[in-house]
From Swiss-Prot:
It comes from Nostoc sp. (strain PCC 7120 / SAG 25.82 / UTEX 2576). It is an enzyme of class 1 (oxidoreductase). This is Pyridoxine/pyridoxamine 5'-phosphate oxidase. The lineage of its organism: Bacteria, Bacillati, Cyanobacteriota, Cyanophyceae, Nostocales. GO terms for molecular function: FMN binding; pyridoxamine phosphate oxidase activity. Its cofactor is FMN. Binds 1 FMN per subunit. Catalyzes the oxidation of either pyridoxine 5'-phosphate (PNP) or pyridoxamine 5'-phosphate (PMP) into pyridoxal 5'-phosphate (PLP).
Amino acid sequence: MDRTIADLRKDYTLEGLSEIEVDPNPFIQFKKWFEQALAAQLPEPNAMTIATSTPDGQPSARMVLLKDFDEQGFVFFTNYNSRKGQELAENPQAALVFWWAELERQVRISGRVEKVSESESDYYFYSRPANSRLGAWVSNQSEIIASREVLEQRMQEFQHKYENQEIPRPAHWGGLRVIPSEIEFWQGRSSRLHDRLLYTLLNDHSWEIHRLSP
């Protein structure tokens, strides 16, 4: 065993997380924590890991950016033909993880996934810088390419194609919404006795809260 890795550890001492203090609505609680992450000026507080899997259970995970959230769910945008897009089309379940190290906090979210409306995808797509919109056309995401020059050549081609005209949203690009059935809030505590509060969605659409052992 490499002790330089095994001995890496940090004791968490900032604050606790109490059932009495949290909001009974997990979306309101998430908003509170997210606003605190923004106020702390964390780098990309909307960065999250999304884990997907094939129907036979082969998992994959990657970082994406949260672009919206409300009581309907948590929204991100992607190429629907990418690996995650294809896996979610076949198995529309996902897990999200936010890690805010400076606040010693983690949020885990799991639930089903659905596409957002065409109008929602359009609204976000047309708010993006022109080169980002072109990038949605240039990249056949997750496909093997021979070299970076392939991307640069395709960028030049699409820059020429859409010169002096509006860049349309590709049909294969848009938003996905994770509709949670569980949301867990984790607060680091001393001696690895962390606080974990799990919100679970009930059949009547209310949420119950349970404390989990760390």
